[in-house]
Amino acid sequence: MPKWIRSTLNHIIPRRPFICSFNSFLLLKNVSHAKLSFSMSSRGFRSNNFIQAQLKHPSILSKEDLDLLSDSDDWEEPDCIQLETEKQEKKIITDIHKEDPVDKKPMRDKNVMNFINKDSPLSWNDMFKPSIIQPPQLISENSFDQSSQKKSRSTGFKNPLRPALKKESSFDELQNNSISQERSLEMINENEKKKMQFGEKIAVLTQRPSFTELQNDQDDSNLNPHNGVKVKIPICLSKEQESIIKLAENGHNIFYTGSAGTGKSILLREMIKVLKGIYGRENVAVTASTGLAACNIGGITIHSFAGIGLGKGDADKLYKKVRRSRKHLRRWENIGALVVDEISMLDAELLDKLDFIARKIRKNHQPFGGIQLIFCGDFFQLPPVSKDPNRPTKFAFESKAWKEGVKMTIMLQKVFRQRGDVKFIDMLNRMRLGNIDDETEREFKKLSRPLPDDEIIPAELYSTRMEVERANNSRLSKLPGQVHIFNAIDGGALEDEELKERLLQNFLAPKELHLKVGAQVMMVKNLDATLVNGSLGKVIEFMDPETYFCYEALTNDPSMPPEKLETWAENPSKLKAAMEREQSDGEESAVASRKSSVKEGFAKSDIGEPVSPLDSSVFDFMKRVKTDDEVVLENIKRKEQLMQTIHQNSAGKRRLPLVRFKASDMSTRMVLVEPEDWAIEDENEKPLVSRVQLPLMLAWSLSIHKSQGQTLPKVKVDLRRVFEKGQAYVALSRAVSREGLQVLNFDRTRIKAHQKVIDFYLTLSSAESAYKQLEADEQVKKRKLDYAPGPKYKAKSKSKSNSPAPISATTQSNNGIAAMLQRHSRKRFQLKKESNSNQVHSLVSDEPRGQDTEDHILE
């Protein structure tokens, strides 16, 4: 079956006109019962066998349609999410028909735009031009809020009013004709796409070991195995993981932990989905103690969420700082749940400060102001960084807030990461507890052999920043091409130079940054929702902002006429004016002015370098269009020439790195990285120290601290300068297997575990026992509700002496003994019969306190 038809099946067909062969049109119409119209046209067509079809009414295929199509030998059912509710169907249809009140064109609604592949070189308006055949794109899972979907997913819409379809006798004939004709018209050939010029290799440090690199010969479509169809890989939680999910659904504050590879991060992602379904997407704060860990779960650092900066100062000072920020104040007021990953690196003092802030802002004396808490991490891994070497480390579980608020502490026991390598699991568990025997030491020393040289570059982990910098600089020197040096601009009101230099070291942005084309880099600042501290990417080119402005406009609309580029190339002032209009949109003047001054100051900090031509790989997005039209080919060539001219006009200007970043979901994003500013402020928000620099650092090698929470298929670890408890365990447990692990300078005397952590872990319970306790508590609660007092309600006394139950309201009005019975319900009573009084009923207690007790009935 033609790929175009396959990609259309069991999805909404676009309302705009589309081009297909006549046979494909008949096949689609017969199978889908879609109300289609068509017109014969020769413009842009090679023969009259091709028609322009248009959907009169949006249509969705049912399961019966899919069953019919699956009879074909060539049919491959796409493994992708289906719409399930009529409400969603109506919403999508509404979005398709929605028109902009100004230009009367369909609005670029988020759900509608999901029909268009984000990496497509065509614009929205060009997707359905008569001269272009562009198949409708699949709907990705992220197109819809999963919280609004049913838990039991079907394979498609079921319409009970429409009978199952009968197979047409000409089905095979139509199918074969469609294959031959559709292939001749495919605009994008998946097998012949231009390779992305993205350097040789990149070790992507993500939580998903199946996608571990970006290669020069691998485009985005190859990241999914089914020819462009995004495959939904189902997450199957273990029984203990499901038990923890149920505890969270019941509103409990939870801390769960486990050894490396027990699926803590996977469970956390599923729990976040559940919590967002309960509280709403905007009311669940997803955070982590480090930027890289936050990147893995799609969140931000706890410091960034809370609005406390570095968290220095007493709790009241930080509270006042949060109060001054409307954004952070609103966050604290509205959230229903707070998720913190890698809680082990958060110290007790900071956790108590956050608890104080939450209670004060929310005016609620419950722990964290009544916010549901979900903590995850492993205290056997890296401890909090001690600010004062003379003060002992205090873990988060030692804080007052933890003891008051976190009642469910659970240990995960099933290992997934090193599953199948029982020996490796045992070695890691011994290292975790600091209990290394002779055999374990021998096994780790065997791993000093070099790793096989294949396509995947091993990530290198070191214990100190100096070692990381040395390794990264060595890798950079091996790359060909010119080195671009970016010097930071430091400032601030602090006069003590020694203290100032020490504070500047807290910034992740380096004082001097060396980059080349092909360098692997990491973002060190949160810029937006998808580009955060910890995002990894590769430098593919250097260009000035003016050139990038033209380049971005061309990538957004490859069909842009060359005349527009000619105007900008011949008249740079018009280009600058267009840039200023673009940058000022949506920004307050003060903010825009500050950003402009930062960039200008950084640009003046270096002399312009000689301009080298843009690499041809930058224009690969235009070469993906397969066409024999000489006019189109000439336009593409002309646009490349104009871009080179605009680039050459940038002589004397600072050129910035153009980086292709890789997200945790394997999508890519091209960004011209511009300078950012960092500052440490006093109580009046006056900068004590500040730095302006590109928010990048080289990332072939990482410190062990930054690697916590990562899964690395190939990793090289040097333990020569390990200095912290848990540091060696974190580094070695990043590996998936011994085959992908190289260990240098292993020393068993450096493998230690903290005694406080060992004692704390002895108090943890299993997920199964915690859930059983929850069920028992619910039964007790239900029993209490069943026996709760009320009008005309007969309750059994809880007193073991069979004391009377609370008396009904009618009796209370006639008998003054009711108040006394309620005050002393747990004491023994003996009441004598009284004449001329209303009848009073009392039930016999089912919990006798002694054998000599008697049942008493009030009458």
From Swiss-Prot:
The keyword Amino-acid biosynthesis does not apply. Keywords: ATP-binding, DNA damage, DNA recombination, DNA repair, DNA-binding, Helicase, Hydrolase, Isomerase, Membrane, Mitochondrion, Mitochondrion inner membrane, Nucleotide-binding, Nucleus, Phosphoprotein, Transit peptide. Residues 142-157 have a biased composition (Polar residues). One of its GO terms (molecular function) is DNA helicase activity. Residues 844-859 have a biased composition (Basic and acidic residues). Mg(2+). To a lesser extent, can also use Mn(2+). Phosphorylated. Undergoes RAD53-dependent phosphorylation in response to loss of mtDNA. It is an enzyme of class 5 (isomerase). ATP binds at residues 258-265. It catalyses: Couples ATP hydrolysis with the unwinding of duplex DNA at the replication fork by translocating in the 5'-3' direction. This creates two antiparallel DNA single strands (ssDNA). The leading ssDNA polymer is the template for DNA polymerase III holoenzyme which synthesizes a continuous strand; ATP + H2O = ADP + phosphate + H(+). Present with 259 molecules/cell in log phase SD medium. This is ATP-dependent DNA helicase PIF1.
